[in-house]
Amino acid sequence: MNRKKSREVAMKLLFEISINKNSISDTIEHYKENNEIENLDFEYIERILRGIDENMEYIDSKIEESSKKWKISRISKINITILRMAAYEIFFEKDIPCKVSANEAVELAKSYAEENSFSFVNGVIGNLINSSEEK
């Protein structure tokens, strides 16, 4: 199964959920019905989506602490989606190296976010990693 592609799909679904306010189950089911799903790790995708949903307050507080002077409400929806995924992986998915989460998030930002957002995303994630290591 392709983790990189699964991470990209998870990001797209998380973004869709943030816009449409549909349930995780409905969003995943709709995706499966309308897209090619071969080589996707839906166990990982669902774990990420549910984990972020269940830990949103904690994740957002960590992002806000790490984004120096930026409130969550000021961060674009796509950037906050990418940051939430990276933060979830950093704090809750201990089998995923922090550097992998950081690199994948920066690549997603380069592909989907505003032109120079990847540097903002990279800086926030660096701070998230540092705060996770302080525990």
Swiss-Prot record:
GO cellular component, one term: cytosol
GO aspect biological process, one term: transcription antitermination
Pfam families, alphabetized: NusB
UniProt feature coiled coil, ranges: none
Keyword field: RNA-binding, Transcription, Transcription antitermination, Transcription regulation
InterPro entries in UniProt: NusB-like_sf, NusB_fam, NusB_RsmB_TIM44
SUPFAM superfamilies in alphabetical order: NusB-like
Superkingdom to which the source organism belongs: Bacteria
GO MF annotations, alphabetized: RNA binding
Signal peptide start-end: none
PANTHER family (alphabetical): ANTITERMINATION NUSB DOMAIN-CONTAINING PROTEIN (PTHR11078:SF3), N UTILIZATION SUBSTANCE PROTEIN B-RELATED (PTHR11078)
Protein family (similarity comment): Belongs to the NusB family.
UniProt-listed HAMAP family: NusB
Known role: Involved in transcription antitermination. Required for transcription of ribosomal RNA (rRNA) genes. Binds specifically to the boxA antiterminator sequence of the ribosomal RNA (rrn) operons.
Protein name per the record: Transcription antitermination protein NusB
Lineage: Bacteria, Bacillati, Bacillota, Clostridia, Eubacteriales
Encoding gene (name): nusB
